[in-house]
Amino acid sequence: MMKLLNKFKSRRRSLDDLVFDSLNTVFMLLLCIVMLYPMLNTLAVSLNDAADSVRGGIFLWPREFTLYNYEHVFGQAQLIQAGFVSVMRTVIGTALSVFCTAMVAYTISRQYFVLRKFTTLAFVLTMYFNGGLIPTYMLMRELSLIGSFWVYIIPGIIGVFNLIVVRSFIEGLPESLFESARIDGAGEFTMFFKIALPLCLPVIATISLFVAVFQWNSWFDVFLYNPSHANLSTLQYELMKILQNSNASISSGSAADAFTRSQGGSTSEVVTPTSVRAAMTIIVSLPIICVYPFLQKYFVKGLTLGGVKG
């Protein structure tokens, strides 16, 4: 009797698991569709003839395939310069931010650091309170950062959230490693570069992704500090201007105004703000999409281990 009852419970449990797995699979598929469709639709519009796109009806694949939208984008000297600035601020900003954040995190993770609690509190307070937009602008002006590339790097060189994550990760490392190194005569810099930094690679990869995405997607600091410096514009800022022009063209209600003829009045090769916007969106999204799979294995591990003591 007991065997029969256990067999019945096991069969019922298997049925419940099957129903749960099926519903979970359907839900995840719907979620994937919701996330992928906007990107696939944007890709289809960017690969479709601009004049044909005005008719609408493009969903997952282009109706009249063309690469002219991308040729038009890459043919703009300003966009090439903006792309160079975006790459430079992402590379330099990420490297400096990760290095400085890791160094400060190591410092405040040491129990014998006298100002450990005060320094931590000072950083944490900046997460909740700031000086405001106008005082920040005045500070950047007094520091002679307006009109400079470094205005993109220095103000956000240390992210408090990233700092807390790295500090918690370092605090979780065996203290015996540092004690042994100290007995052997190693100084703080040696312990940081030879012990802490190599062991922090998972969390370093995690915050590197955070900082890189932030730097690559930033446009408001360009709008605020360097709107009149074309040589310091970024791809995201140029995309924002294209979006504004597109909205202005749509609001005017004139389809003719939406077309930009690119070759001396030729009607065979045209682009619209919508087609250029789609191409620009794919271009600025592609680097992050390509980088993320390589950092994904570190992402959950680094964030989880770094947040245990946070």
Predicted region positions:
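A hydrophobic, multi-pass inner-membrane permease signature
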Residues: 2-310
